[in-house]
Swiss-Prot record:
Entry's Gene Ontology molecular function annotations: proton-transporting ATPase activity, rotational mechanism
Assigned protein family: Belongs to the V-ATPase V0D/AC39 subunit family.
Biological processes annotated in GO: vacuolar acidification; vacuolar transport
PANTHER family: VACUOLAR ATP SYNTHASE SUBUNIT AC39
Protein name, entry field: V-type proton ATPase subunit d
Disulphide bridges, residue numbers: none
SUPFAM superfamilies registered for this protein in UniProt: V-type ATP synthase subunit C
Any GO CC annotation of this UniProt entry: proton-transporting V-type ATPase, V0 domain
TM regions (residue ranges): none
Oligomer and partners: V-ATPase is a heteromultimeric enzyme composed of a peripheral catalytic V1 complex (components A to H) attached to an integral membrane V0 proton pore complex (components: a, c, c', c'' and d).
Known function: Subunit of the integral membrane V0 complex of vacuolar ATPase. Vacuolar ATPase is responsible for acidifying a variety of intracellular compartments in eukaryotic cells, thus providing most of the energy required for transport processes in the vacuolar system.
Keywords, comma-separated and alphabetical: Hydrogen ion transport, Ion transport, Transport
Keyword Isomerase in record: no
Length: 356
């Protein structure tokens, strides 16, 4: 008997016994993802109050009930995110090993963004309580309770960060002095590299359908980060080519040959040339650099495709990751439409990324 979701298993019955109930709940959640008809109706709205009324007929229900008028886009984003967090916690609180650890890995990406926010705010002497309010709720951690004792980055490192689940990444990659001296985006990418490699190895350890689905998803995420790091580094004097290459995750379709070439690239045209030999990235990169559709949009579209395909599979944990990411894209779509309505830019309203 081989590995199945990290267990010595006897087939789908073992998966169904431990994780089948939660997968069924998740697939029920998935049915509530907005349809193309829902998006068409949202795009017909004249104001945000109309959007509020339309949401009542969707899975979002009356999630904006009680919100005073006029409703703001930030309120819609906050409440939609709150719904996603509630669903995530519902699954996580009932999960057993190894699904519980897999769900924790999902939260670590948001935790990294929160840590970077706290470091940035501390360096600029921002109010700590204000920083916590801006943290993503999926990336909260217990040692945030000790933030009241933080007065500088040394306090943050020694009293907070080393007690987070990210401690192995932080202690393995960053020193206390780095927080004060290193560019904040280098810190973010250093932590994310360690996180992606760890998550990828964990999915390989789980094996089975989890490894199969998550391998494609995480390899794409690694490639996206490598491409973005390269493009964003052009003109950045504090980042040498050698330092840039150290930030690339050690996985992906581009790794190692493509990332080695990216490390030597001088401009966007050279990046485009490097990616020409990779059919996955060739077209949407050329579509997205100087045209109306941004490179970021092309990345989001491919991410949606990979996560949507995860639901064609069964008996693995990929759907749990995919659902969170699809809902996240849905929230971006909702916010985009709401912003277009608020700013009277209805001609751009249809530039959202459909999911199903």
């Amino acid at each position: 008997m081989g590995l199945f979701g990290g267990r010595k298993h006897g087939g789908l019955f073992t998966f169904n016994k431990d994780d089948g109930y939660l997968e069924a709940i998740l697939r029920g959640f998935k049915k509530g993802i907005l349809s193309r008809a829902d998006y068409n109706n949202l795009c017909q709205c004249d104001n945000l109050e109309d959007m509020k009324m339309h949401f009542i007929s969707t899975d979002y229900g009356d999630f904006l009930a009680g919100e005073p008028s006029p409703i703001h886009t930030t309120t819609i984003a906050e409440k939609a995110t709150g719904k996603l967090v509630s669903e995530f916690n519902h699954i996580r609180n009932q999960a057993v090993e190894p699904l519980s650890t897999f769900m924790d890995f999902i939260s670590y990406g948001y935790m990294i963004d929160n840590v970077v926010l706290l470091i940035t705010g501390t360096l600029h002497e921002r109010d700590i309580s204000e920083l916590v309010d801006k943290c993503h709720p999926l990336g909260l951690f217990k040692s945030m309770a000790t933030l009241s004792v933080v007065h500088n980055v040394a306090d943050l490192y020694n009293n907070v960060l080393i007690d987070t689940p990210l401690a192995p990444y932080i202690q393995g990659c960053l020193s206390e002095e780095d927080l004060d001296e290193m560019n904040i985006e280098i810190i973010r990418n250093t932590l994310y590299k360690a996180y992606l490699e760890d998550f990828y190895n964990y999915c390989k350890y789980l094996g089975g359908q989890t490894e199969l689905i998550m391998s494609d998803i995480l390899k794409f995420e690694a490639d996206r980060r490598s491409i973005n790091i390269t493009i964003n580094s052009f003109g950045a004097t504090e980042l040498s080519k050698d330092d840039r290459e150290k930030l690339y995750p050690s996985l992906g379709l581009l790794y190692p040959e493509g990332t080695s070439k990216l490390g030597k690239a001088e401009d966007v045209d050279q990046v485009r040339g490097i990616l020409e030999v990779y059919s996955t990235y060739r077209n949407f990169f050329s579509d997205g650099v100087n045209n109306e559709k941004s490179l970021e949009d092309s990345f989001f579209e491919h991410e949606v495709h990979l996560n949507r395909m995860a639901f064609e599979d069964q008996y693995g944990y990929g759907v749990f990751y995919a659902y969170i990411k699809l809902r996240e894209q849905e929230i971006r779509n909702i916010v985009w439409i709401a912003e277009c309505i608020s700013q009277n830019m209805k001609q751009k309203m249809n530039q959202y990324i459909p999911i199903f």
